[in-house]
Regions:
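Short acidic/His-enriched helical or mixed secondary-structure segments at domain edges of catalytic enzymes
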Residues: 214-228
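His/Glu-rich zincin catalytic helix
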Residues: 4-8, 12, 16-150, 177-184, ...
């Protein structure tokens, strides 16, 4: 975004994001790389935890356009679980053990049960519709109970409270990217939220998000046919 300060964070893996801006500022000041003839004149920092940080300054707007890019996309999907990267993109909006739940201690056993049931479901032969339907109904039932503890859209509310705009994400063949546009004076608070987001994501509201991913896929397929 040429009209804003741009930060692109590239994660080597889905791992906890360490941060302490003040402590490391002096250390980082003279330890960056640059790309020759880069029109954005970006500085590229590599933190001790392997995190790559790209900084490009534009002084006309007191806001920060942020991208957290995870180097995993649809080409990394297992052959028996296509769409997994896109699904994970959606699940990273569902909170952690510290936010997104009314009572995580009560919710957690149900989420573990759903996971175990789904793994069992995946092992059933596709032609065995009777057992697949039976197990899916069981998954659906437990998911309904677990959903009673979920707080919908809490991540979105948290970033909205610090003035974020354009909160979104997308999945490509090689990356999954999480997007926000935040006030520059809320950078440290945003880092706290994102650090927590990646520390221990909890995959709650399983059914709801699975349906949302399928709906997006159907819309994309329909659009491609209309443009053909």
């Amino acid at each position: 975004m040429k009209s804003k300060l741009t930060i692109i964070l590239i994660l080597v893996a889905l791992a906890w994001i360490g941060y302490n801006v003040n402590k490391n500022m002096n250390k980082l000041e003279n330890s960056y790389e640059k790309v020759q003839n880069d029109p954005m004149n970006a500085r590229i920092y590599t933190l001790d935890n392997g995190l790559k940080v790209y900084l490009s300054v534009y002084k006309d707007a007191p806001r920060v356009q942020t991208y957290i890019a995870v180097r995993a996309g649809s080409k990394n999907d297992p052959s028996d679980a296509t769409g997994l990267a896109h699904y994970l993109e959606h699940m990273l909006f569902k909170g952690t053990d510290k936010y997104g739940s009314l009572d995580y201690a009560k919710e957690e056993p149900m989420l573990k049960e759903i996971e175990a049931l789904y793994e069992e479901y995946r092992q059933i032969d596709m032609d065995d519709t009777e057992n697949r339907d039976r197990l899916w109904a069981q998954i659906d039932s437990v998911s309904g109970e677990a959903a009673k503890f979920a707080i919908a859209n809490e991540y979105d509310k948290m970033v909205s409270n610090i003035g974020a705009k354009g909160t979104n994400a997308y999945t490509s063949a090689e990356a999954t990217v999480y997007v926000n546009d935040i006030p520059s004076n809320q950078l440290e608070k945003w880092l706290e939220i994102e650090s927590e987001r990646f520390r221990m994501p909890v995959f709650r509201l399983f059914h709801t998000e699975l349906e949302a991913v399928y709906e997006e896929k159907n819309m994309l397929f329909l659009s491609s046919r209309l443009l053909a």
